[in-house]
């Protein structure tokens, strides 16, 4: 995966390629090769290898970028003036809408790559932690009755 600093240092062309790869991966990525991707994206193999040292690493970069995009979309849906329950609704609605475009082919291939599945699990755990913290805040403010928010 790309460190956030490295992501910020990407050229415009590299960002465009990663965006295009996200769209390509929607059709599934298990059978894609670096050479096939380079031909499809009209770029050199060297350009792809500058993004990641292997096909498997490139898969992780693209998946991680997609998951971060979903997370940013959800976080940006929260208005600082919202109460915790409204913020939770907005956050979960935005996250749900962001993942609604996930294709069966992408989900199938994601499940078949253990490292990509771990990335997905990590991002899901973060989403759950945000939801729990918003519920905890709602309990603290008296918006909802005291409950064990970790159980939800």
Predicted features and spans:
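Hydrophobic/aromatic residues within well-ordered alpha-helical segments
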Residues: 13, 55, 62, 66, ...
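Hydrophobic alpha-helical connector segments
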Residues: 61, 74-101
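Short hydrophobic clusters on alpha-helical segments that form packing/core surfaces
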Residues: 17-25, 66
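Amphipathic alpha-helical packing segments from all-alpha helical-bundle domains
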Residues: 68-71, 115-141, 150
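Short amphipathic alpha-helix in the helical subdomain of ABC transporter nucleotide-binding domains
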Residues: 10, 14, 146-152
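Helix-turn-helix
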Residues: 12, 20, 27-57, 61
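N-terminal intrinsically disordered/low-complexity leader segments
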Residues: 1-15
């Amino acid at each position: 995966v790309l460190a956030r600093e490295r992501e910020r240092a990407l050229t415009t062309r590299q960002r465009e390629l990663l965006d295009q790869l996200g769209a390509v991966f929607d059709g599934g990525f298990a059978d894609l090769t670096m050479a096939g991707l380079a031909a499809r994206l009209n770029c050199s193999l060297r350009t792809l290898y500058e993004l990641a040292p292997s096909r498997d690493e490139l898969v992780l970069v693209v998946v991680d970028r997609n998951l971060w995009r979903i997370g940013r979309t959800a976080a940006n849906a929260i208005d600082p003036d919202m109460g915790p329950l409204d913020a939770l609704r907005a956050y979960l609605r935005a996250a749900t809408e962001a993942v609604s475009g996930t294709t069966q082919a992408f989900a199938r291939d994601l499940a078949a790559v253990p490292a990509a599945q771990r990335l997905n699990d990590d991002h899901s755990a973060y989403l759950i932690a945000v939801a729990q913290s918003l519920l905890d805040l709602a309990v603290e403010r008296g918006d909802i009755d005291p409950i064990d928010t970790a159980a939800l």
